[in-house]
Every structure is written in C-alpha cells, then in structure tokens.
A protein has these predicted regions:
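Non-catalytic substrate-recognition and accessory regions of acyl/acetyltransferase enzymes
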Residues: 1-140
C-alpha cells in the first residue's frame, strides 16, 4: 500500500486496480483523487497494455470535476499528489505498458514534457503520440 497518510484506499496489484487519495489538505474545496489502472489489451508478444485514468472530486461530491480554474500554486501541489500516486503504482507493480490518455490533444507535447520532468522512471521508456503518453517497461 502507498505509504502516505493521505492514501485512503489502495486496491491494486499487478493486474490493475485503484487508489483513493485525499486531497483535502491541498485546498478547502477538494476531497479525493482516484487513480485507476485497467488492462485494456495485449500486445502480440503477450505484454499487457494498461489504461491509466485519474479523477478529481470536489468536497462533498460524487461527480468528478475539472480543477483547471484553480490557482497555479494549488494545481502544482495537486500534480505532485497525482505523480506520487502514479509513481507508486509504476514502481511497485511494474506494468508492461501504460497508456495515459490526454483529453486535450493540442496539449500533448506540453504534457509530455511535464510528465518527463515529474514522472521520469529509470525502468521505463516514455513516448507520446497524438493523444497519449506511453510508459513502456524496459526489457531486462
């Protein structure tokens, strides 16, 4: 389990799962971040392709929201939490291939640079295409 006092629940293993992480300490309007990993397909050589998705929930809501309107400093702390959770899953379970779908394709190059800066992992090659950022576990 993620060794962090803000981790509320960690139901994941090598086959996917989810993590619930409290973000209340980051902003009074925020409640929970959920990060899921789900196997969606397999490569011809038998490696699993995981889909990664996170959602942010405002305080008292069961409907995820867009937090883009919040101040840059608050979002910087939020991204640190998101990357902490992502780093935990990738480093602990070493999924073969992870797809991070970027919902605004025009921002993929900027988001790719951001991921390279904040989620650089020695066991993974990182690349991108028009809509996704890919983490591919290096062969041993």
């Amino acid at each position: 389990m993620l060794n962090d006092p803000h981790c509320l629940r960690c139901e994941c293993d090598r086959h996917g799962g989810y993590i619930e992480y409290s973000i209340r300490h980051l902003h009074p309007d925020w409640d929970v971040l959920t990060q899921t990993y789900e196997i969606r397909s397999m490569t011809d050589d038998g490696r699993f392709i995981y889909h990664s998705d996170f959602q942010l929930f405002p305080l008292g809501s069961s409907i995820p929201a867009d937090f883009s309107q919040y101040p840059r400093a608050a979002k910087a702390a939020l991204w640190q939490a998101i990357f902490r959770v992502k780093r935990y899953y990738l480093a602990t379970f070493e999924p073969d291939i992870v797809q991070h779908l970027i919902k605004q394709p025009f921002s993929v190059p900027q988001r790719f640079a951001f991921y390279c800066q904040h989620l650089s992992l020695p066991n993974y090659d990182i690349s991108h295409d028009r809509y996704n950022i890919w983490y591919v576990l290096k062969a041993e």
